[in-house]
Amino acid sequence: MSARLKGRRRAAAALIDRAIGFAATDPDVTAMALVGSYARGTPRLASDVDLVFLTGDVEALLTPGRFEPLLGERERLVRARTWGPLHERRFRLRSGLHVELGIVPAAWASVDPVDPGTAGVVRGGLLTAHDPDGRLAALRDAVDASRPGDVL
């Protein structure tokens, strides 16, 4: 593994640790998960850190500057998109690391039924980082018990 990749992984690990603390202390965050390549344990140098924040108040988490305690003051928003219920905010940090925040209503993790898009995210790799009410664990269990293509 190159020194550059090791440095990128250290920066990502530090960001993930901060995200766990942020999620645990922000009253608007009901749960948080790491998804994608870092959740699968297969990040590459170009991989971004993908975090999904569940909330009862999506608009509160979309307020500009809301994630500054997590990302730092010098982050740069490079993309904002909406994918169904998921509001994507992609940032480039001063270190060069890209971070993709997905802000979703808590119902995104519903298991009755599981949304096919949500199931795809879970199958692509999901590690629960903050889940005080067990919502993400129940979602992961429901998806794990199914097969791709099943109606959940």
Where do the PLM segments sit?
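Helical scaffold of the NTase/Pol beta-like nucleotidyltransferase catalytic core
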Residues: 1-33
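Residue-level marker of motif borders
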Residues: 31, 43-45, 91
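Short secondary-structure capping/turn segments at boundaries of alpha-helices and beta-strands
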Residues: 18-21, 35-40, 75-78, 86-89
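Conserved NTP/Mg2+-binding pocket subregion across the NTase superfamily
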Residues: 1-8, 71-152
